[in-house]
């Protein structure tokens, strides 16, 4: 199901694997996959992000093609769907991510920090927090209790603050982590 996109060049240095020509084996779920998958082209990092974005839209408001079973019709709907229409009932931050993905190519290294920043803007705009409980959590105190016990037993007997617990549970990524490019791609 997966294929390495990094190989070695003639000198033995890491290089991005060139996309294979011709029709490729279909990998994916029609509802979530990228247009490259529908078109049987080789897939890169951007195609993973298309699957991720389609999943977010599905979870938030449902994809327009969610009831369609025919792959060709799903591909046609995706190809004809304006980004504004797809994202109209989604958080405002989804649209710039969608538009950004449309400019990426197979070999492109996505700007993950920009995507992350858009998502954080949405969290801030909604005045939300990583510490808010999910709907399925019985009590907002469950997470705090679990983290406090863990935190106190490992480091100190002082109770952990909400901010400290949030950092432990959901560390805020710093831009240098996203910009770090250990493989050079």
Language model segments and positions:
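Activation segment/activation loop of eukaryotic-type protein kinase catalytic domains
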Residues: 1-31
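Conserved end of the kinase activation segment
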Residues: 35-47
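Conserved C-lobe helical segment of Hanks-type protein kinase catalytic domains
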Residues: 36, 96-103, 118-121
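Hydrophobic anchor on a C-lobe helix of Hanks-type protein kinase catalytic domains
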Residues: 37, 59-60
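A short RP[S/T]Φ-enriched loop at the C-terminal end of the protein kinase catalytic domain
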Residues: 46, 106-113, 127-128
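A conserved short alpha-helix in the C-terminal lobe
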Residues: 47-59
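C-terminal lobe of the eukaryotic/viral protein kinase catalytic domain
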Residues: 51, 61-106
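Extended, low-complexity, intrinsically disordered C-terminal regulatory tails
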Residues: 70, 79-89, 113-117, 124-185
């Amino acid at each position: 199901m997966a294929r390495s996109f990094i190989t070695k060049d003639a000198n033995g240095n890491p290089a991005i694997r060139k996309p294979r020509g011709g029709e490729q084996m279909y990998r994916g779920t029609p509802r979530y996959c990228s247009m490259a998958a529908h078109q049987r082209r080789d897939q890169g990092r951007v195609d993973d992000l298309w699957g991720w974005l389609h999943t977010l839209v599905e979870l938030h408001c449902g994809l327009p093609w969610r009831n369609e079973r025919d792959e060709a019709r799903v591909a046609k709907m995706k190809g004809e769907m304006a980004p504004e229409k797809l994202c109209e009932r989604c958080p405002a931050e989804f649209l710039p991510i969608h538009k950004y993905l449309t400019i990426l190519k197979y070999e492109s290294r996505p700007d993950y920090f920009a995507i992350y920043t858009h998502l954080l803007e949405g969290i801030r705009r909604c005045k939300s927090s990583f510490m808010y409980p999910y709907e399925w959590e019985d009590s907002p105190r469950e997470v705090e209790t679990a983290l406090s016990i863990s935190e106190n037993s490992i480091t100190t007997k002082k109770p952990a603050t909400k901010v400290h617990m949030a950092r432990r549970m959901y560390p805020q990524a710093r831009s240098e982590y996203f910009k770090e490019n250990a493989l050079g791609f």
